[in-house]
Regions:
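Bilayer-spanning, highly hydrophobic alpha-helical transmembrane segments
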Residues: 12-16, 231-263, 278-296, 577-606
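Short, hydrophobic transmembrane alpha-helix segments
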Residues: 20-33
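Actuator/coupling domain of P-type ATPases
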Residues: 29, 36-124, 128, 140-147, ...
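Juxtamembrane helix-loop transition segments at the membrane interface in multi-pass membrane proteins
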Residues: 52-61, 105-116, 294-313, 622-628
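Conserved catalytic phosphorylation-site environment of P-type ATPases
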Residues: 63-71, 173, 274, 284-360, ...
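Membrane-embedded transport module
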Residues: 247, 509-513, 550, 555-628
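P-type ATPase nucleotide-binding
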Residues: 340-466, 475, 484-503
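Conserved ATP-binding TGD loop and adjacent catalytic N/P-domain core of P-type ATPases
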Residues: 402, 428, 434-578
Length: 628
């Protein structure tokens, strides 16, 4: 509990004890009134203060005003009737504050899930100077600086390990409890905790651009984006509260006047004013105003604990209505780790063909280029390469040792007018031409992720109507992967722009109430991520583009996290609708009973505080998503 919560709990206990003791004291009249005023003010002075400030600021109609009017009115009736029954007024304020304390604790609990993620923020970075370590502010570390991370410390800035081996705890970012190995040459992201060895890391980004900064910025902004349900409840409360206040006023005034002037009967002012005050307590919209945002907040907190970062409750709500999921193949359903599985050459020797291909691809960071460089396995002398030109969706041309080399797909060969040989093997075929003559081709294969097939099956179980895969790979390769994984629809041999067109087409074809989610690995996917109803970036650790463009960011590359994200969103929305129906139904029944004089102030307390506590308890279930 926070200091503020402990103080409130002390006030509640003190007021409750006094209320019980006062009922055993044989006092009447003004003394009884003064004595009961003590627990009333102990527990409710801040509510009265807020209500008065609201009146002064012309923001009258809120829950503080309702509670203040209802309790002061109840005291006035008891005082006027000389009944001495001030219990109801004190009890209303007491139970209302119990509900507020409960709500504060619930929000704090859900916020702690996000706060745990906030703990990834590093306090310092170690730099070696004159043989000793100096702690500096991460903001002061420039790109290219070698920092030292000791066991137990957080990695402050993204970089590459230049010396040392260790294991890293990435659970705060990914939700994955298994430590990750790190060695020289490995890329490493900020926010991880170094567990074992000392690591020397050469920074590749400034602190403000590092993964930890991007993630924290995303999480901090997530609570500001409200869902349609939250906006509806906010607007509802804006008009609902004044309406019930005027309704209560009408209930207090009109029936007595009708009795007096139309029926010639006694007006029974006290009875109708009491009904109106009961009506006010029942009508307090706390259960809705508190539990709906809390459901989304807890849902976002629970998701973040699992390495699923949702940029706002509006995206969580939209995700629950997803019926179409479109995948980019490479790095999403497959590992994106390509391997050369065959080199078919003409007159040039295999080693030389692979060398020329590796040199031509040496400036590219594409996974296929990296696989060719790995297959060559030797250090590349880039001074031998010049006039490099990358043709999007086709391949690369360059001069190697003065010779014209073209490395790419069938489209590149057709573009250059070079006859090529087809290959019977399933995989990505990289054709090569040297000095305008066909030199052979390299067969590269991507490996499917072990959980991709299970993820597709579970998505369908979760209510996804259609799964679609988009890829730039050859039709033969794409069809094989789609068949293996159980994908419903596949579109192959696409350029980056073609993927946007395909998503546009799917958006036009789908039903209006069904959302379309696009899942990519964040590399060259920004336009499509932004165009889909929901953009999901998977394996986004270290990818600025993914974090910027996506609506939902999965911090590791497990396709099953997509299923979990959708299940979390559905659970969250289900709880939101449960709370709305439950709160409105109970309040509706109690309001009718209150207006008819059947319900008293004690039932009103249940209709207000009881419903609020039950709704909050239900909302807190969105925190528990581990087993989804």
């Amino acid at each position: 509990m926070t200091k503020k919560q402990k103080k409130m709990l002390t006030r509640i206990i003190a007021a409750a004890v006094l209320l019980i003791l006062l009922n055993f004291l044989p006092v009447t009249g003004i003394i009884r009134f003064v004595l009961f005023l003590i627990p009333y003010l102990i527990v409710g002075y801040d509510i009265l203060k807020k209500a008065w400030k609201g009146i002064l600021n012309r923001q009258v109609f809120d829950e503080n005003f309702l509670m203040a009017v209802a309790t002061v009115g109840a005291i006035a009736i008891a005082f006027y009737e000389k009944s001495g029954d001030f219990n109801e007024a004190v009890a209303v304020m007491l139970f209302y504050q119990i509900g507020e304390l409960f709500q504060s604790y619930a929000v704090g609990k859900s916020r702690r899930n996000i706060s745990e993620l906030m703990d990834i923020r590093p306090d310092y970075a170690n730099i070696e100077q004159d043989g000793s370590l100096e702690q500096v502010d991460p903001d002061e570390v420039e790109i290219g600086t070698v920092i030292i991370v000791q066991p137990g410390e957080k990695v402050p800035i993204d970089g590459v390990v230049v010396e040392g081996t260790s294991t890293l705890n990435t659970s705060a970012l990914t939700g994955e409890s298994v430590p990750r190995e790190a060695k020289a040459g490995d890329e490493i992201i900020s926010g991880c905790i170094n567990l074992t060895g000392v690591l020397k890391i050469r920074t590749t980004k400034e602190f403000g651009e590092s993964t930890v900064s991007k993630v924290l910025e995303l999480v901090e902004e997530s609570t500001s984006r409200k869902s349609r349900s939250e906006n509806f409840i906010s607007k509802f409360a804006k008009y609902y509260t004044p309406a019930v206040c005027y309704g209560a006023l009408a209930l207090a005034v009109l029936p007595p006047l009708v009795r007096m002037f139309a029926m010639g009967a006694a007006p029974q002012w006290n009875d109708w004013i009491y009904r109106a005050l009961t009506f006010l307590v029942i009508s307090c919209p706390c259960a809705l105003v508190i539990s709906i945002p809390l459901s989304f907040f807890a849902g976002i907190g629970g998701a973040s604990h699992e390495g699923i970062l949702v940029k706002g409750s509006n995206y969580l709500e939209a995700l629950s209505k997803t019926k179409y999921v479109v995948f980019d193949k490479t790095g999403t359903l497959t590992q994106g780790i390509f391997e050369v599985v065959g080199v078919h050459h003409n007159q040039m020797e295999e080693k030389q063909l692979l060398e020329y291909a590796a040199l031509t691809e040496s400036a590219s960071s594409h996974p296929i280029s990296k696989s060719i460089q790995r297959a060559y396995g030797k250090e590349l002398d880039r001074s031998r390469v010049s006039e490099i030109e990358e043709i999007s969706g086709n391949g690369i041309t360059a001069k190697v040792d003065g010779r014209s080399v073209a490395v790419g797909n069938v489209k590149l060969m057709n573009r250059l007018g070079i006859p090529y040989k087809s290959c019977h093997k399933v995989g990505t075929i990289i054709h090569m031409a040297i000095d305008g003559e066909y030199a052979g081709h390299i067969v590269i294969s991507d490996v499917e992720k072990p959980t991709s097939k299970e993820a597709i099956a579970k998505l369908k179980q979760a209510g996804i109507q259609k799964t679609i895969m988009l890829t730039g790979d050859a039709k033969q390769v794409a069809d094989q992967v789609a068949a293996d994984l159980g994908i419903d629809e596949v579109h192959s041999e696409l350029l980056p722009g073609d993927k946007v067109e395909q998503v546009e087409r799917l958006l036009a074809e789908k039903p209006a109430k069904a959302n379309l989610a696009f899942v990519g690995d964040g590399i060259n996917d920004a336009p499509v991520l932004g165009r889909a109803d929901i953009g999901i970036a998977m394996g986004a650790m270290g990818s600025d583009a993914a974090i910027e463009a996506a609506d939902v960011v999965l911090m590791d590359d497990d396709p099953l996290k997509i299923v979990k994200a959708i299940r979390i969103s559905k659970k969250c929305l289900g709880i939101v609708y449960q709370n709305i129906v439950f709160a409105l139904a109970v309040k509706g029944v109690c309001l009718i009973l209150g207006a008819l004089g059947i319900a008293n102030m004690w039932l009103a307390i249940f209709a207000d505080v009881g419903v609020m506590v039950l709704a909050i308890l239900n909302a807190m279930r969105t925190l528990f998503v581990k087993k989804l």
